[in-house]
């Protein structure tokens, strides 16, 4: 004979498994737009999230995505002709939209540029999902820090106002990958929450390490927008060092600079950096640094090597010459040797292919293809940290409320 109390409790727990927005209440599903090689997926998977759909239209990135996530439905078409209402609903939709028109290396056209304007397309897709009863509960938008300042902050304001019109509250934070891997990579995350499911949190602007000057300015300009501030902890102290990232390359490998290339490096290295390197060469200890080749500032357009002595790599970029190329500089046994950063090292700087992080992630394509893909991607542990301390904090509360409803029914029956 069935236990009526147990049955009633189970019915209460599963009452909303298929809610009005089309997704199972207990499932943590997401749609990954601008998916690239899938590093948002890699960040979410250990937290129990399942990809309902991925979308990108770069053939090389798509091959890499399919190699690592063959089970995920992947639509390889322009997002502008993608009808998300044709696909299963998801609790979360993510968008690492193109940064080229926002970044310092781009033409600074902002949201009017050909590429970065696709965030408007993304927001239109969210609006369409609302109209077909598949409104996502959460959104995650990621991009470069210039999103906060370009065109006097009007690009960010446009995104936030559109989210408000779609009845989402939002938090905006800046997180640097250097707290997780030895890479200086500061990024902006917009976490949006459906106000129909989660009451707005009205509180003072938390002027902290995650919400610095430009964000404070955005809040002062728009205090009446539905800001939804999360209680983030302090950013963690990084455990990985640059030595953990660097491959062990045999000294006989041709990837190391020859004498002519080494002399070229010494001829272009910044003066103060050259003095530091010369002093370290005399010290007898081994050291590992990264370096980039840049244009000398405030002078003629001539190249110069800058060496980082802070234990970090510079922000990974897509290959294209100039400062997009990073070098590994090693001092050992009184000698200086150098080479280009490898594809595996680029992957490790983004938090995969490491014993602690995604050791089985597959690198697909040529060395240049891999560097391009990772230069255009996200830092996996940084994204995971943002999700863990924002969206993840809301989902358990919902589950507890459903469970509490079942317990209350049990007490009533008893």
What do these predicted ranges mean?
Residues 17, 252-414:
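C-terminal target-recognition/interaction regions appended to catalytic cores
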Residues 97-98, 136, 353, 380:
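Proline-centered helix-kink/hinge sites
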Residues 96, 138, 340-343:
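Short aromatic/basic micro-patch
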Residues 38, 59, 98-102, 145-146, ...:
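Short, solvent-exposed loop/turn segments at secondary-structure junctions
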């Amino acid at each position: 004979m069935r236990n009526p109390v147990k049955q009633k409790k189970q019915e209460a727990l599963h009452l909303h498994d298929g809610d009005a927005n089309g997704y199972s209440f207990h499932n943590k599903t997401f749609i990954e737009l601008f998916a690239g090689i899938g590093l948002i997926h890699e960040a979410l998977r250990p937290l129990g999230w399942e990809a309902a759909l991925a979308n990108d239209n770069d053939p090389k990135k798509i091959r890499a995505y399919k190699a690592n996530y063959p089970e995920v439905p992947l639509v390889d078409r322009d997002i502008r002709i993608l009808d998300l209402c044709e696909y299963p609903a998801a609790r979360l939709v993510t968008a690492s939209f193109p940064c080229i028109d926002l970044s310092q290396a781009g033409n600074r056209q902002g949201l009017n540029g050909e590429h970065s304007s696709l965030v408007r397309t993304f927001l239109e897709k969210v609006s369409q999902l609302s109209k077909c009863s598949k409104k996502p509960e959460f959104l995650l938008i990621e991009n470069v820090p210039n999103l906060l300042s370009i065109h006097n902050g009007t690009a960010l304001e446009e995104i936030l106002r559109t989210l408000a019109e779609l009845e989402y509250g939002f938090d905006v934070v800046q997180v640097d990958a250097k707290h997780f891997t030895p890479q200086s990579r500061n990024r902006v995350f917009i976490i949006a929450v459906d106000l129909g499911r989660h009451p707005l949190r009205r509180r003072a602007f938390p002027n902290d390490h995650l919400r610095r000057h430009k964000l404070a300015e955005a809040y002062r300009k728009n205090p009446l927008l539905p800001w939804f501030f999360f209680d983030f902890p302090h950013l963690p102290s990084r455990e990985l060092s640059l030595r953990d990232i660097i491959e062990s390359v045999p000294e006989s490998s041709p990837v190391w600079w020859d004498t002519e290339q080494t002399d070229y490096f010494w001829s272009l290295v910044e003066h103060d950096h050259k003095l530091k390197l010369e002093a370290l060469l005399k010290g007898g200890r081994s050291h590992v640094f990264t370096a980039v080749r840049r244009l000398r500032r405030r002078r003629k357009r001539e190249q110069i090597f800058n060496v980082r002595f802070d234990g970090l790599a510079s922000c990974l970029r897509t290959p294209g010459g100039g400062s997009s190329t990073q070098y590994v500089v090693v001092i050992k046994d009184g000698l200086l040797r150098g080479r280009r950063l490898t594809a595996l090292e680029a992957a490790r700087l983004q938090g995969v292919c490491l014993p602690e992080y995604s050791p089985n992630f597959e690198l697909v394509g040529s060395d240049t293809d891999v560097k391009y893909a990772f230069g255009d991607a996200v830092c996996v542990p940084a994204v995971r940290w943002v999700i863990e301390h924002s969206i993840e904090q809301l989902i358990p509360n919902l589950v507890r409320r459903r469970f509490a409803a079942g317990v209350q029914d049990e007490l009533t029956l008893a």
